[in-house]
Amino acid sequence: VVIDGTIAMNRERDLDFGDVVRNSVVTVPVNSNGSARWRITGTSGAGVTLTFFLPSFLQVGSNTLPISFNNTAGGESWQNNPRFANLFDPNAVHTTQLRPSGLGVLTVWLGGTVTVSALQPPGVYTAPATLVVSYTGS
């Protein structure tokens, strides 16, 4: 029996589209300062799965704003630089590993796209995006 140590996860920033205008489509890519970022630490070289629970809409009051995540809206790297990120589809479970030498670390990013209608009511729209990280056992 091999008992792995614990996984620690720290959300370093939220996905932020900034100010957007009506009648537009706005994308925040993984390598943008607006992308969400998590730092994960655990057993060096351990396999992990990344599972996102993503919203379909952002909301303020009863008003909604569509949000989507394409097949390159997720990114992960042993380095804390999205330029080196391996892109993945956050709509599917993603399997990877923590850095195999030194501290077992992984940085994860999330981008996304909002579609703003011509009649979109103003407001600060929000919704939770949840990341679950689990050891794979390998």
Please tell me what each predicted stretch does.
Residues 1-63, 97-138:
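N-terminal small/polar-rich segments of proteins
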Residues 59-98:
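Terminal beta-strand-rich extracellular "head" domains
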